[in-house]
């Protein structure tokens, strides 16, 4: 009987080890950005911001750490290695002169997780990378649209007691809650229908004016989870550049996320920091 118990314990431990292939620690900044410590080409120690909306890596013109061993040609560098902890990733592409978030020298994308399940675990400040389907108990499945290396999910916006569905790009580099496209903002009259708590005016070199508005969305529903009083930004004015809706870092951090290897599904569970209403 004792031998059977030992064997069962060993098999359970082995199963856990096989499923959780590796963990990557990160630090969450006060701006809600994820920072990963890396060693590039075995020489350059860089703090890179995780950007879920890209696959490759980049360095910023405002970086504070040296990148002497990343060789660029026409602002592109191929064949680099990136070491995180004890794991080294090879053949990584870097772009030069791309701006990044606070406290970082550049960005790191999802390419290091290619063809694998991966989890953004905000509760424990780590990524978990799996070599097979992990335990998804207590997670809710959501359809995922994956295009050009970017992740999109559908969600509902409650505006003036009306439910408006839209697709959102997951954008961990933008520190706010939501950012709406110009089209969505115009179609649903956000300037009139949201409570506005802030405004910033910008004038470009041609004299055209752009206003950045900060509003409050009463309810935002993703899957069966409802967030209340979510900060939501949008633009008004003569400049029309915002083509996509964003679910940004302040909303992303309220959940733990597991992405499947095929990038067709994402599984979410509320994080410990989240105060929300769950629809039964």
Where are these regions (language model features)?
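Pepsin/retropepsin-fold aspartyl endopeptidases
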Residues: 20-280
């Amino acid at each position: 009987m004792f031998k059977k118990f030992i064997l069962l314990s060993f098999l359970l431990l082995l199963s856990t080890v096989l499923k959780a292939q590796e963990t990557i620690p990160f630090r969450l900044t006060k701006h809600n950005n994820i920072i990963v410590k890396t060693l590039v080409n075995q020489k350059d120690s860089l703090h890179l911001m995780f950007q879920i909306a890209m696959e490759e890596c980049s360095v910023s013109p405002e970086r504070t750490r040296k990148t002497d061993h990343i060789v660029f040609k026409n602002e592109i560098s191929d064949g680099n290695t990136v070491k995180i902890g004890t794991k080294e990733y090879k053949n990584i592409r870097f772009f030069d002169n791309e701006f990044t978030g606070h406290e970082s020298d550049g960005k790191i994308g999802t390419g290091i997780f290619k063809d694998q399940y991966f989890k953004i675990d905000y509760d424990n400040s780590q990524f978990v990378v799996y070599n097979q389907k992990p335990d998804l108990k207590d997670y809710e499945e959501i359809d995922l649209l994956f295009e050009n290396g970017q992740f999109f999910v559908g969600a509902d916006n409650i505006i003036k007691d009306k439910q408006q569905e839209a697709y959102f790009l997951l954008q961990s580099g933008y520190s706010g809650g939501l950012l709406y496209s110009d089209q969505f903002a115009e179609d649903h009259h956000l300037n009139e229908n949201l409570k506005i708590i802030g405004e910033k005016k910008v004038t470009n070199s041609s004299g055209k004016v752009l206003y950045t508005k900060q509003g409050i969305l009463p309810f935002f529903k993703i899957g069966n989870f409802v967030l209340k009083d979510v900060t939501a930004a949008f633009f008004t004015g003569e400049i029309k550049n915002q083509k996509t809706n964003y679910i940004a870092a302040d909303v992303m951090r309220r959940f733990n996320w597991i992405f499947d290897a095929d990038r067709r599904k994402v599984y979410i569970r509320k994080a410990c920091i989240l105060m929300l209403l769950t629809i039964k």
